Amino acid sequence: TSDYSSRNITRTDRDQPGYDVNGNVSYTRSLSKRSRLSFEYRINYTDNSVERNTFVLTKENVFPDERNPRQSTEYDYAYLTHRIGSTYQYYFKKTKIAGTLHYQHAAFSSDYAFPYARKTETSFDNLTYSVVANINVNRNNTLKFNASGRTSNPRATDLQDIVNTTNRQNVFAGNPGLDPVYTHRLSGQYIRANPAKGRTFTVSAEATASPNTITDSLVIDSPDFVIDDEGTKLGEGNQYPKPVNLAGLWSLRASVNYGMPVRWLRSNLNFRAGI
């Protein structure tokens, strides 16, 4: 086996061309004087090429023409995303309600050419939603609700089924088995206003939940840890992160706010408490 902890003087050349193409089409139809329905389709294609060549200074103090295979890399990757859905909107006086539902299909492909050939393909199918309501109970009282579910797909570098040794002190590996991050959010707000006296009272609450997030599994202080199929060791002082899904991220926030005018200050005074 070889030890990856040796230190050398290097020169690195990097080239990363890419392009992004997207388009969308939508159609909206009124269902009544108070409601309407719209349909939407979006497509996005992202293509990138990465070439990083590292040359190690020889004993003769010259950089060779041949790149170092352990610190050089060459690959292409692409993301193709289709998104289709509809939105329903309802209006009555000062009350507004809107609901959106989308289906999204994202296909990822990567061709790793150097230092070894490796192809990675995966896809994600997700449903995202959004519901927004703004209800005027009367002149002084308003209720607001918001519920949404959104996804964030893994990055291209996180999905590649390779061990990247271009950074000598931070060797990292991809994980093609990653799942998207799905975040659900629910919030509500009650507002009581007294326009005559300029006073407002607000109660707000918000809950967020992500059943699975993406974080790094980190190997440190393990110089004998084998990082690839060739038996290369991590080496002294280096670290080895790898992205993984981690379950259970929850948060809850709430606050109360009271505002009133202060004439002698010619300004408003606000009191706020929250958790």
Predicted regions mapped to residue ranges:
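Primarily recognizes Gram-negative and organellar outer-membrane beta-barrels
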Residues: T1-I275
